[in-house]
Amino acid sequence: MDGIKYAVFTEKSIRLLGNNQYTSNVESGSTRTEIKHWVELFFGVKVIAMNSHRLPGKGRRMGPIMGHTMHYRRMIITLQPGYSIPPLIEKRT
């Protein structure tokens, strides 16, 4: 299961790293319990809280036709003190 798409690095998410909270975009069809079990198994950490929200897709215009991108889900995962997740940085070329 590839539940986590990629890590999110915004001003807020970088600030939350100090509170042992990690932010990432996940598959929109995934549930909280699926993501929690996947994070605990894959990274070997203990999750104490998860917050999620769905972000709307952005409008895209292609000539006279107006379309939109898909909406997506963002999770803020809080870990127990003493645990950490290595950065999920994907190199872009």
Swiss-Prot record:
One of its GO terms (molecular function) is structural constituent of ribosome. The keyword Chloroplast applies. One of its GO terms (cellular component) is ribosome. InterPro entries: Nucleotide-bd_a/b_plait_sf (IPR012677), Ribosomal_uL23-like (IPR013025), Ribosomal_uL23/eL15/eS24_sf (IPR012678), Ribosomal_uL23_CS (IPR001014). Its main location: plastid. Gene3D superfamilies: 3.30.70.330. PANTHER family: 60S RIBOSOMAL PROTEIN L23A. Part of the 50S ribosomal subunit. Binds to 23S rRNA. This is Large ribosomal subunit protein uL23cz/uL23cy. It comes from Drimys granadensis.
